[in-house]
């Protein structure tokens, strides 16, 4: 009655096309990941149908699960007489929450984001004709994986950073920023290049869920190692 969710249960059925391989696993893992729940059960079915094989594109599996869960969150909020944002704040995952898919969260920004959104003037501004205001929470993972970079400090104080992950959306710029911050030098002193395969150690697949995250960690460790030497 106080708005605290005690348990959550979901059954997901994802269409995989002519062959198995729908993103139902990611949907099941992310469905309740935004919330601090003591009891969770999620069942997923990878359904084969007479259609073309599907492929991943941007957080595969997660938006569909989020749409279903967030729609229910709004319904539950109304039933207990709470605003949707307050209901989410009440149940939001935070640092120390054991996620619905296993790991315990470190520092995450969901709760602070919701609280800031609630305080923003736009959230309380009167609505005009044919206007509405909605909100929802979503989740996606950062994946690690084997990653290798090479960082060299030149005689003129500039830094050459070789990475083995092709640039997708400015990832080289992110690596330069991380290296510069860790080394305590200006950003324009760092140059990142995508090196040949044979010049670096092994790198796992380059995709949007791991490139900046995993290559960034490797860059930071390489910079710290350079400082020690």
Would you name each region that the model predicts?
Residues 1-65, 127-229:
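Gly/Pro-rich active-site capping loops and adjacent beta-alpha segments
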Residues 56-118, 208-229:
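N-terminal leader/propeptide and maturation segments of large enzyme subunits in energy/redox metabolism
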Residues 82, 123, 184-185:
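Helix N-cap/coil-helix junction residues
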Residues 103-140:
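Short, basic/aromatic recognition patches that contact phosphate-bearing ligands
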